[in-house]
């Protein structure tokens, strides 16, 4: 790491913050594909055994400017020798080189080593674990919620304009604009959701960076207007797309947006407004009247259309009352219901009844969508009947069992905060029987004959793992253990939405 920092410091000193020359530095591409930097750069090594060459990079950049070479239709994009997905590894080398270089001005981990600056953690963005206290402590006291899907795609020039505030190299921005427009022409980046999925798989780091830049710009304006419209700050929680922390965020937005938003409408004032986001989905929750929520809805639509030039219909943003509708967020179905109770009180010779109806939070496991996710992963059919899963022939019985146990444990931990855990028994039953059928298929036997041979204790770990974990903290016979097993427990190893819980 010190070696690459020394290289970057040398280039920074010589080129005066110019990023374009870094495209011709071979250590940039080594930085992108080295095993030692995967955890930092969020890039999974995909098997680049050959070293990138300076001549290859120059040749590819030259071809980008040859318009005759780039005149390829969208239908032939899979056969494109330059941008083809998994057709030519050199095309991904240069595209991921773009991502590494454009992250340098935003990476305080490297910049702080040059300037001796300390990393400043922004208080505006919190960890994923702040979602759990929001569900437990804040949501029962709120009345209305709004499901907001952050619209995309956006115009490429808006992305370039966002990057221009931090990237000062005009040559690099020009080449980046040309690069993005070629993706746009081939219907790969900004046309359909399927196209974005292809682009995010072929260029994960580049996609994450562009998406994060767009989200940060949107939330900067949104939180600025929210704070300006109320004496109390807008309470916000959220995380970057597949990242836990945002190291720095511009705090002073007044000078930037004063010309665009000279007057803040007074009707947006609401000290009880909460904003929570994960990836591209966010919610607005308020204790106030639905009239204010409607005004916030049209305010968001106008912000997207007028500032980001993204079409969004107001009818796609639904305002729901928590007492009547469930909130689908992060793979949980959350609702607030009244828990009526009657208390008899006596004062001197007079006795009277007091009706009390406190609000209670219910977090329910979405059993039907979860079974649908298991069916897509080939653990069961569409009706929820377990089936055998295809596995590699060289896997041992212990490895197959361990994989099923790991999936079951992750789901059990993820939904440990649910109010009714009995529905998880059906999921565990599907995984257990699917594991038995998979092992029986490997041994060319039936599930009944295999269980009779190995004994039923072979798969009992599917139901006893959580109790054994809690027994390490409390005695197994104590009342506290039984109460915790029935109650809600949020595990700190939940750092992202579970793949099977993501039903969208």
Swiss-Prot record:
Cited InterPro entries: Domain_X, Maturase_MatK, Maturase_MatK_N
Subcellular location: Plastid, Chloroplast
Keywords, sorted A to Z: Chloroplast, mRNA processing, Plastid, RNA-binding, tRNA processing
An example Gene Ontology molecular-function term: RNA binding
The UniProt record lists the keyword tRNA processing: yes
Keyword Cell cycle attributed: no
Domain of life: Eukaryota
Disulfide bonds: none
Any one GO biological process: RNA splicing
A GO cellular component annotation in the UniProt record: chloroplast
Function: Usually encoded in the trnK tRNA gene intron. Probably assists in splicing its own and other chloroplast group II introns.
Family: Belongs to the intron maturase 2 family. MatK subfamily.
PANTHER family (alphabetical): MATURASE K (PTHR34811:SF1)
The name this protein goes by in its record: Maturase K
Organism: Fagus japonica (Japanese beech)
């Amino acid at each position: 790491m010190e070696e690459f920092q020394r290289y970057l410091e040398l280039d920074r000193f010589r080129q005066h913050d110019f990023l374009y020359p870094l495209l011709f530095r071979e250590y940039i591409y080594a930085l992108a594909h080295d095993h030692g930097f995967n955890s930092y750069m969020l890039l999974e090594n995909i098997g680049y055994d050959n070293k990138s060459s300076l001549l290859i990079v120059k040749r590819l950049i030259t071809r980008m400017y040859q318009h005759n070479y780039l005149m390829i239709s969208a239908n032939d994009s899979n056969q494109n020798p330059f941008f083809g997905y998994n057709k030519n590894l050199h095309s991904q080398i240069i595209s991921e080189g773009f991502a590494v270089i454009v992250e340098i001005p935003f990476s305080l981990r490297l910049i702080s080593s040059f300037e001796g600056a300390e990393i400043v953690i922004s208080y505006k963005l919190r960890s994923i674990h702040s979602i759990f206290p929001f569900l437990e402590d804040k949501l029962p006291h709120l009345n209305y919620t709004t499901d907001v899907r952050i619209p995309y795609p956006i115009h490429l020039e808006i992305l370039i304009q966002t990057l221009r505030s931090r990237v000062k190299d005009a040559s690099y921005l020009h080449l980046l604009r040309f690069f993005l427009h070629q993706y746009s022409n081939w219907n790969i980046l900004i046309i359909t959701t399927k196209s974005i999925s292809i682009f995010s798989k072929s260029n994960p780091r580049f996609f994450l960076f562009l998406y994060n830049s767009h989200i940060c710009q949107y939330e900067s304006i949104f939180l600025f207007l929210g704070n300006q419209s109320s004496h109390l700050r807008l309470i916000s929680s959220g995380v970057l797309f597949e990242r836990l922390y945002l190291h720095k965020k511009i705090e002073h937005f007044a000078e930037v947006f004063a010309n665009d938003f000279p007057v803040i409408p007074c009707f947006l004032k609401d000290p009880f407004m909460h904003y929570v986001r994960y990836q591209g989905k966010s919610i607005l929750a308020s204790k106030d009247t639905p009239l204010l929520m409607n005004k916030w809805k049209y305010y968001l639509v106008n912000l997207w259309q007028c500032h980001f030039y993204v079409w969004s219909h107001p009818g796609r943003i639904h305002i729901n009352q928590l007492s009547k509708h469930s909130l689908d967020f992060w793979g949980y179905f959350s609702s607030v219901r009244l828990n009526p109770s009657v208390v008899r009180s006596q004062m001197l010779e007079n006795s009277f009844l007091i009706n009390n109806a406190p609000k209670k939070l219910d977090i329910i496991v979405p059993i039907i969508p979860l079974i649908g996710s298991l069916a897509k992963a080939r653990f069961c059919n569409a009706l929820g009947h377990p089936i055998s899963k295809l596995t590699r022939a060289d896997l041992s019985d212990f490895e197959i069992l361990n994989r099923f146990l790991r999936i079951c444990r992750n789901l059990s931990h993820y939904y440990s905060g649910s109010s009714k855990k009995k529905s998880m028994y059906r999921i565990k039953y599907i995984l257990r029987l699917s594991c038995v059928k998979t092992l029986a298929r490997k041994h060319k036997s039936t599930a009944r004959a295999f269980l009779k041979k190995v004994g039923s204790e072979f798969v009992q770990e599917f139901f006893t793992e959580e109790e054994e974990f809690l027994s390490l903290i409390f005695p197994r016979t104590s009342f506290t253990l039984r109460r915790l097993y029935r109650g809600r427990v949020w595990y700190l190893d939940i750092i992202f939405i579970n793949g099977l819980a993501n039903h969208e």
